[in-house]
């Protein structure tokens, strides 16, 4: 079946693409990571940082002078390349950064026990910001709108990659984030506007469902750990021409891939740089103007916006 082109400018209001009057395709000066300096010893983990959005998120935290960066990916060669680029970036700005890597399968619980051990041994158990960026667009049979034609293993892999891994990350790493030495107490889950979609010929059902579950999980974590100071935010990174997007999406949808890959990283740093409990448990878009968003703070909290609920 031919895939129709998608025009996000005509998206329904409930998708929230234009929740702020101003939107961006590149980081604005107001959220430039290089204008941020994190406290001494600040430690960040980016799960799924071998390429694309995750790689650029890690670079944003280096620009913001985070001293400790841990990056993970399934592919060791990708991690080696990103590690070198992060270290070079730090040298260019005259700062010291410790970059650690871990080859892991984000869908396996044992990967997170190894990550926890790495943090315990190498960083005294400190974890300020956790970014869960593992995920990927479906391939193969999952693009069919007919569920009976999908492959079971492909379906399960898609759900595990886009959602279940976030549960493992929270289960094993949140205890570290609640320790006194971990000051940031921030989790950013990279989701997708695809969580709004139901048309299987535009977004595969497994991907939409996985990201929708991630959004709800973000809300649950944010509410259940609010009294312990944890801030959890789901972020749609924009639509960028990443290797993953170009490799999984049909060519007819490539027209929407116009957002800068560094935009999401800048927003992640904006979330982390100060306590933003007013957006905890909520969904935001990296394309939104963060000043506009902050101006809506009272409205968002009072009306409990940017959360999923049934319209009745």
From Swiss-Prot:
Short chain dehydrogenase; part of the gene cluster that mediates the biosynthesis of pleosporalin A, ascomycone A, as well as a third cryptic naphthoquinone derived pigment, all responsible for the coloration of conidia. Essential for the production of pleosporalin A, but not the 2 other final products. The pathway begins with the biosynthesis of the cyclized heptaketide 3-acetonyl-1,6,8-trihydroxy-2-naphthaldehyde by the NR-PKS pgmA. It comes from the Eukaryota. It comes from Aspergillus terreus (strain NIH 2624 / FGSC A1156). NADP(+) binds at residues 46-47, 171, 207, 211, 242. Pathway: Pigment biosynthesis; Secondary metabolite biosynthesis. Its EC number is 1.1.1.-. One of its GO terms (molecular function) is oxidoreductase activity, acting on the CH-OH group of donors, NAD or NADP as acceptor. Disruption phenotype: Only abolishes the production of pleosporalin A but not of the 2 other final products. Induction: Expression is significantly up-regulated at the end of late growth phase, in the presence of Butyrolactone I. Expression is positively regulated by the pgm cluster-specific transcription factor pgmR. The keyword NADP applies. The active site is at 207 (proton donor), 211 (lowers pka of active site tyr). Belongs to the short-chain dehydrogenases/reductases (SDR) family. The keyword Lyase does not apply. This is Short chain dehydrogenase pgmD. Coiled coil: none annotated. Keywords: NADP, Oxidoreductase.
